[in-house]
Amino acid sequence: MNSILRHNWNLKEVEALFAMPFNDLMFKAQTIHRENFNPNEVQVSTLLSIKTGACPEDCKYCSQSARNKTDLEKESLLAVEKVLEAAQRAKEMGSTRFCMGAAWRNPKERDMPYVLDMVKSVKALGMETCMTLGMLSGDQADQLNGAGLDYYNHNLDTSPEHYNQIITTRTFQDRLDTLSNVRSAGMKVCSGGIVGLGEKAVDRSSLLIQLANLNPQPESVPINMLVKVEGTPLADIDDLESFDFIRCIAVARIMMPHSHVRLSAGRTAMNEQMQAMCFLAGANSIFYGCKLLTAENPETNQDIALFEKLGINTETVAGDTERSDNIVKTAIVDQQNSDLFYNASA
């Protein structure tokens, strides 16, 4: 089974992957997954909203957009001490990567010193760090890299062809430019998309082509299933067929064999069997123990129970010789009930 990295995928061959008989597609994806990863390990991340709501963008799916009529209350930038406290709880619970998200079009220069301090403080705990702050200039990317940021998340959201139906305040090229700035600064890229936005099947193929043809490919690829939020233009859109979502995970694994494919937003709408199929298809990363702003993420004990049923262990930070299986004993109830955690579909 060929798992060589490629950056020249075309629509015809990707549509052919999506059209494979389901069992054949799953077998191909799982075989490639086993060539590159331990099939029974999942990387665990935690997300924290460091600044919530009042975003000026017009993303039609998002509760944080000031243009959408949701009940979300805006909040100011969190103090560094609060961020560090949440990161410590996440580490105790078993997360190896701490992701910090702000509802900004782009960070202002006045915000950068606080953001950089957050990165340095979380890094001092021995965790990997990730941020998603909107568009970045080259200089801002350099500053974040200098502070020690490991990953920067900036999703493409959907295909170039469907993009203007979802967002008009930021271009698709703007997103690619930010990813380029992140790469040039020396950081790892976290970039994926959202399915269930009313796109056609061809749009899912096109989105994955855009991601896989990035050179290098993103180290982390979050695949979100739309979380419908009352007050947004997509609140009443038809649900995505479960098998279409699982196929998207499998094709992403085949096209990006060395990337972590994250089963991201939308897991509360998935039963255990669907999540297990996603892991079989090659998903090997989740957001763990979080509460999303717009919908509950599965509670920590539910994830623990599912991992135990499937015989899944959690991945450790590189260089850590001990398993993080003790998350069963150290899960913290306050984190599940906290209102700080960030909407992974944003």
From Swiss-Prot:
Keyword presence, Transcription regulation: no
Top EC group: transferase
Family matches, as InterPro entries: Aldolase_TIM, BATS_dom, Biotin_synth/BioAB, Biotin_synthase, Elp3/MiaA/NifB-like_rSAM, rSAM
Keyword S-adenosyl-L-methionine tagged: yes
EC number: 2.8.1.6
SUPFAM superfamilies xref list: Radical SAM enzymes (SSF102114)
TM region(s), chain numbering: none
GO biological process, one term: biotin biosynthetic process
Cofactor needs: [4Fe-4S] cluster; [2Fe-2S] cluster
Binding-site residues, [2Fe-2S] cluster: 99, 130, 190, 262
Cofactor note as given: Binds 1 [4Fe-4S] cluster. The cluster is coordinated with 3 cysteines and an exchangeable S-adenosyl-L-methionine.
Domain Radical SAM core: 40-264
Entry superkingdom: Bacteria
Reactions listed under catalytic activity: (4R,5S)-dethiobiotin + (sulfur carrier)-SH + 2 reduced [2Fe-2S]-[ferredoxin] + 2 S-adenosyl-L-methionine = (sulfur carrier)-H + biotin + 2 5'-deoxyadenosine + 2 L-methionine + 2 oxidized [2Fe-2S]-[ferredoxin]
Functional pathway: Cofactor biosynthesis; biotin biosynthesis; biotin from 7,8-diaminononanoate: step 2/2
Role this protein plays: Catalyzes the conversion of dethiobiotin (DTB) to biotin by the insertion of a sulfur atom into dethiobiotin via a radical-based mechanism.
Family (UniProt): Belongs to the radical SAM superfamily. Biotin synthase family.
Name the UniProt record assigns to this protein: Biotin synthase
Source organism: Colwellia psychrerythraea (strain 34H / ATCC BAA-681) (Vibrio psychroerythus)
